[in-house]
Structures are given as C-alpha cells and as structure tokens.
C-alpha cells in the first residue's frame, strides 16, 4: 500500500508522469534471481520496508545493486535503523533512505534524477556518499492529507489485479 501512496502523490505532477512509468509492485516473495532479472534494467527501484519484508527487501536490494551498479536504490519505511551512524556501512547497496514521510522527498528525488542527481537539498533523506552518511534534516510534513489521492481510487492497483485474475483481492482501511 505505501508504495502506491507514494506513486499516487507524484502521479499528480505532469513533470513526473511524462518522464516516469510505474513498474510492477514487488508484492510477492518471488525468487530473488527472478526479481533481479525483472528489475535490474530499471533506473530506480524503491523499497518500502516493514518487519514482514525487511529481510527479503534487503537481499533483493543488495542483489540488484550487484547486477546493476548504476541503479538508484531507494529505501524507506519504519524498519531501517536510520538513527544508526553507520547506516550505509550496514546497507552499502542503498543509495538513499527516506526518513519519516516520503511523498514530497520522493517527488524531489525523481525531479533531481533527471537533472543534476544532487539530492542533498532535499529534506528528509539519508544519502550514501561512498559509505558516509549525508543527513538532509527532517522531512517536510504533509499538512493536508487530501493532497494525496487514495491509491484505491486512482487505478494504481488495476493493472496488478488484471494481471493476476486468479487472486481474490480485498482492500483494507487502516486508521489510527
């Protein structure tokens, strides 16, 4: 769900949608080799990491970077220990890790990827600078949640559902 929220947000902006296409979500635990073969030619691959997918995402990100050292590996979610000073010594294959909310940061990353690839002015990131950490400060919070379209209402999941008619899909509403 979280990656779909990120894409729902950035897909509102024409400068993003005319340059980028959303690939298929990593939602099953396919064999790492199969996932790497499918993703290694992408320019950017992002991981939204939680307790239930941390190990898999970590291995997949590491193997993707081995297969294509030029791929930009993004990470986010509550399961990366971003407070650790040696984060990129533990995860040298991750290029950028988003702290807290990632919607605005993700949009800026996509914009900078097309131009100067200098992400240091984007708030809310940890950037891997050859194993050293550049911390760009706190993320810009979203004041109005209505600025993020629901991925359930924007057809983001439609192609995934059409590709897998054998699966009975359901949606979950989660609140605080």
Task: Report the location of each language-model feature.
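Short catalytic helix/loop segments, enriched in acidic residues and glycine
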Residues: 2-11
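Conserved acidic
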Residues: 2, 56, 171
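Radical SAM [4Fe-4S] cluster-binding motif and immediate context
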Residues: 146-147, 151-176
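A generic structural signal for residues located within well-ordered alpha-helices
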Residues: 1-2, 101
């Amino acid at each position: 769900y979280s990656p779909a929220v990120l894409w729902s947000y950035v897909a509102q902006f024409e400068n993003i949608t005319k340059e980028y296409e959303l690939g298929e979500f990593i939602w099953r635990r396919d064999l790492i080799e199969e996932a790497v073969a499918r993703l290694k030619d992408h320019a950017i691959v992002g991981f939204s990491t939680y307790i239930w997918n941390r190990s898999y995402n970590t291995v997949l990100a590491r193997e993707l970077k081995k297969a294509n050292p030029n791929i930009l590996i993004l990470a986010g979610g509550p399961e990366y220990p971003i407070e650790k000073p040696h984060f990129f010594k533990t995860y040298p294959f991750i290029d950028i890790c988003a702290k807290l909310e990632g919607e605005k940061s993700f949009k800026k990353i996509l914009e900078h990827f097309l131009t100067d690839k200098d992400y240091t002015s984007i708030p809310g990131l940890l950037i891997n600078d050859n194993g050293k950490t550049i911390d760009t400060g706190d993320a810009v919070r979203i004041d109005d949640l209505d600025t993020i379209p629901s991925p359930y209402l924007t057809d983001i999941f439609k192609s995934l559902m059409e590709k897998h008619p054998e699966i009975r899909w359901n949606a979950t509403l989660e609140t605080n």
